[in-house]
Amino acid sequence: MSIEAETVKSTEKFALMVDLGIITVPDDYDHATRLTTFLERNRKKFYDVHNDITDKNFPSPSRILKPGDKLCVRAFEQVVGGTTTSEERMAFLETQGAVYTGAQGASILWDQRHDQLPKNKWYCSFDKKERLFKDADGIHRVPRIDIYYGGDFCFYLDLFERAWDVDSIILCFSDLSEPSEA
C-alpha cells in the first residue's frame, strides 16, 4: 500500500474527541529536570507512576520545549472497532501537523488541563520510535496519562509495539511557537 493510501486509511480511523485549547510552557520550565520537578510536585496526586518516567530516560523528544512555547492540544479517539498500530497512529498525527513533545508535553498538559480530560481513557504522547525510551527488554515505551472513572490518575508507559484499542487516546500537540532545535 502506498504512503498516501495508508495516510488516507489512517485518517478515517480517528476523530476529534476533545479540543483542549492552548497550553503554555511555564516560565520556570527546565527541560533537563522537567520530569523530576513535575513528579516531586505531583507524585502524591497520582495513584501510580511508572519508575522509568525520568529525565534520563526521556531526554530528547522530537520537539524540545522551552519557556513560553504555546501548543494547541487536541485528543483524538479511535472510531473503528478492533485495533490500530502505532504506525497508523503516527501516520494520523502527521496529517494533523503534530509535534512530538514526549513525557514532558504530557506532564505540562496534566498540569494545565487534567480536569478537562474525559475519564476512563489513556492519553498517549507518541513520538518517533527512536526518540522513545527503550526498556531492559528492548521495547520502546510511550508515555501516557491514565484517568479512571473514580478520578484517579496514573503516569505510565505503554508499549510502542502493541495493538491499540479505543480506550487509548492520541494526544496531538501542534506548535504555535517558533520551533527549537532537537
Name each region found by the language model.
Residues M1-V99, G105-A182:
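A binding-site-centric feature that preferentially detects glycan-recognition modules on secreted/surface proteins
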